[in-house]
Amino acid sequence: MNKFVLRQAQDLQAKLLKAQQELADMTTEVSSGGGAIKIVIDGQQRIRSVSISPEVINAEDAEMLEDLVMTAVNEAIHKSQELAASHLSGLTGGLKIPGLF
């Protein structure tokens, strides 16, 4: 293999590793239920915090709370994936590389 191509691959690998480390420090926040549920998630799809307003905690309506949490978590994951894709797009040229996230 050409030494130049090998060097480029090594440089790209180092840049991707650095970008992944940066994503661990980037966060986004989402909410559902008019702000009753708040989720903070980082760029590596790790949930950092969950906040639930006492007003939505009701033993007789646990299903509503479950739905609000599920909606917030799914939206948080989606936003985190968008954050990662945006951050990595300059390195990958818009290509979706399996295994990055």
Regions found by a protein language model. Give the residues of each.
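Hydrophobic (often cysteine-bearing) scaffold residues that line and stabilize catalytic clefts
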Residues: 65
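A short interface-forming secondary-structure element
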Residues: 50-62
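Stable alpha-helical structural segments in soluble proteins, enriched in small hydrophobic residues
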Residues: 68, 72-83
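Residue-level signature of catalytic and energy-coupling elements of molecular machines
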Residues: 9, 45, 69
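N-terminal intrinsically disordered, cationic/polar leader segments
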Residues: 25-51
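Long amphipathic alpha-helical segments used for membrane anchoring, targeting, substrate engagement
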Residues: 1-29, 79-101
